[in-house]
Amino acid sequence: MTLRLQPVQVATGSDEDGMLIFDGHRLVAVLVRLSGVHEDLGVAGQWFLETGYGPLDVRDNPTFADLVAAEAWVKQRLAERA
């Protein structure tokens, strides 16, 4: 499995820094970096799964401390469904 991350701008309003995650040539997830608006929740600067596809399409979208944690979760989910 080869994951590729590509930075993008996402039109969500407050959280614009995004990351597309590809498994090979297939888009499997869109992450957004949570802005300071989320400071009161203690998650500002963390990465949120805006949407996932296939095995990453989950009911409760997770938040990750950093991209390393997000990549590890993506790899685990994809491996479970392989």
Explain the meaning of each model-derived region.
Residues 1-27:
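Negatively charged, low-complexity tracts enriched in Asp/Glu with abundant Ser/Thr
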Residues 1-3, 29-32, 65, 76:
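Intrinsic-disorder/low-complexity peptide segments enriched for small residues
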Residues 11-15, 34-36, 62:
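Acidic interaction surfaces
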Residues 27, 60-62:
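A generic structural signal for ordered secondary structure
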Residues 32-60, 77:
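Short aromatic-glycine-(Arg/Gly/Cys) micro-motifs in beta-strand/loop hairpins
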Residues 54, 62-82:
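A short, charged, amphipathic alpha-helix used as a generic interaction element across diverse proteins
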